[in-house]
A protein has these predicted regions:
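TRNA-recognition modules of translation machinery and tRNA-sensing kinases, especially anticodon-binding
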Residues: 2-297
Length: 297
């Protein structure tokens, strides 16, 4: 994307006059703690607009929408690789030992746990919106200011169960589906192919999508698109019966954010800030938001 095309009036979203009226971090901190803001008035409306836009575009791309549980058991979190690797980053309930989902990837992937799916149905494509909950222990500095890093945030997830022979082609298609959202929102972005040192132990290949935040003058990650090959499927025992051999074989699982809302919001605010303090809403979002501008006063 062309980062020079952003507003000449861009400032960091958290420094925009009136930001705290629509994104109330102080009251959120009082009620829950740091990183749990209230979205008030048109801020809440804009979140709802983004989620509706994401889900509608994902449906056009062939993903079937699912509304999943937002708490999962230890078996589900183990199947996707959150346990034991990220146990300290998740919110856990007692005495039931259920975990608040850090991403819809966890309940969605487990949809077919301990099942054999029809090979003819592959690839199976699903999308889901959930609030996501992450402790983010150890985060500090500019990375946590404003909407950059929250303990609770909204995200739409894309997920595919695919035949092993096509999993890398399907990963590229999934990445393009996420890119399509950024293009329609007219946000400058870049695609990073992550090196082995930046992969989780469960991932075989990962792309990160980052948007340019013109006020902060930095790139913000809004999506990671990953191929897990058979790692999650082996833990979850998700298989298909091969027509060629007649035996059950493991599927490959892929997922990616489509997209994470807070940083997309931050980029829209910063890149589209006008001289009068209003924010111009991307044209694709206007039918969902109902207005052409977001005002902070």
């Amino acid at each position: 994307g062309d980062v020079s095309a952003v507003s000449p009036h861009a400032v960091a979203h958290y420094d925009v006059p009136g930001f705290d009226k629509l994104f109330d971090f102080n009251r959120g901190s009082k009620v829950t703690g740091a990183g749990f803001p209230f979205y008030v008035g048109d801020a809440a409306r804009l979140v709802r607009a983004l989620l509706g836009f994401f889900l509608d575009e994902d449906a056009k791309a062939g993903y079937i929408e699912v509304n999943p549980p937002i708490f999962v058991n230890a078996a589900s979190a183990t199947a996707t690789g959150q346990l034991p690797d990220k146990e300290g980053q998740m919110y856990e309930t007692t005495p039931d030992r259920l975990f608040a989902v850090p991403t819809a990837e966890v309940p969605l992937t487990n949809f077919f746990r301990d099942e054999i799916v029809d090979e003819a149905e592959l690839p199976i494509k699903r999308c889901a919106y959930t609030p996501c909950f992450r402790r983010e222990a150890g985060s500090h500095g500019k990375d946590v200011r404003g909407l950059n890093r929250l303990h609770q945030f909204d995200k739409v997830e894309l997920l595919k169960w695919v035949h092993p022979s096509s999993s890398y082609d399907e990963l590229d298609k999934l990445r393009l589906d996420a890119e399509n959202l950024l293009k329609k929102l007219e946000l400058p972005y870049r695609v990073l192919l992550m090196c082995g040192g930046d992969l989780g132990f469960s991932q075989s290949k990962k792309y990160d999508l980052e948007v340019w935040a013109g006020g902060q003058k930095r790139w913000l990650e809004v999506s990671s698109c990953s191929n897990f090959e058979s790692f999650q499927a082996r833990r979850a025992q998700i298989r298909f019966r091969s027509k060629e051999t007649g035996r059950p074989e493991l599927v490959h699982t892929l997922n990616g954010s489509g997209l994470a809302v807070p940083r997309v919001l931050a980029a829209i605010i910063e890149n589209n800030l006008q001289a009068d303090g209003r924010v111009k809403i991307p044209q694709a979002l206007v039918p969902y938001f109902g207005k052409e501008y977001l005002a902070f006063n």
